[in-house]
Amino acid sequence: MLKNVYVSGAEGVARVARMMAGLRAQPPEELAGKRVIEVIDRLAGTAIAPETGKVIRNVEGTKGDVLVFVLSEDGHTRVTIRPSGTEPKIKYYGAIKKPTKFGMSGAELKSLKAEALAMLNAYVDSLVAEAEKRG
């Protein structure tokens, strides 16, 4: 799931920078009522505990202005935020993994998908609001 929020002009670009800095300095401890387990900061190469702000582990991989808010112990439910490198916008990505069972009907799968999408929209909208507060 992807949501784009467009900004305009130099002030918009500065606002996006403030949002990212604010989320790094003071990450939300929950999104839509769901506890944030860790925040992965791809720029710093670390994962932090949002309650304490302390680094809990180093993270390997590509460096970039990206924050990942992990909402499940298995790491499969997450919301990611990053500024666009080519357009005046900030991008929010949501991902979730819901368990399925062999033999689920089409209606059951459709219902599960709708439930997952509703959860993702709530998490992403919550992160948008948190970013706006900091921008």
Task: For every predicted segment, state its role.
Residues 1-82, 93, 100-104, 109-135:
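Phosphate-binding and adjacent anionic-ligand microenvironments
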Residues 89-91:
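General beta-strand recognition
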